[in-house]
Amino acid sequence: MSDLGQLAEKLAGALGPALTERKLAVGELTLTVAADRILDVLALLRDDPDCDFKILVDLCGNDWPRRGKRFDVVYHLLSLTRNMRIRVKVLVGEGEAIKSCIALYPAAGWFEREAFDMYGIAFENNPDLRRILTDYGFSGYPLRKDFPLTGYVEVRYDDELKRVVYQPVQLVQEFRDFDFMSPWEGAPHIMPDGGKAASGNPGKKA
């Protein structure tokens, strides 16, 4: 099966209530599934011969602070035999844990650690769920929308103490708020109807 539309129909029937939403747009298929069924869904996508998504390309998080289920956990899968990609998304609330998929995709180990480090999303049964990108003793989750852009502390080498020290962030200048549109013309973005954005500078009025 090499057509994403046909695959979407097949998966809708196979997954049943586990599939809460499906979207096929701009040549990409995205499935939103129930968090408690994520391992069943991933196993089907990996093992079904019509799917054959053997490779986990990436696993990442996303933060929507105003939403009840604050976080997305997004799995990007690749089938080399079918030459297809698929995106699987799960909604997770703050403080909730999601099952690790290491048993299905061993490459998920470090991806899950990164999502934990950046967003605080916990993965059950990950054998080594430690921070992976931030410094030792780091506090907070840098990719959450409510985390300050500057962070809380800065790290520098103190030549007198001959060691690395932490200290509160000291800004060279105060924050500046830019409340106007960019004067530069952006790239022609793909619109929901599949067309292109109108050319010209959206920041200028006729």
Report residues per predicted region.
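Terminal low-complexity/charged segments
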Residues: M1-A206
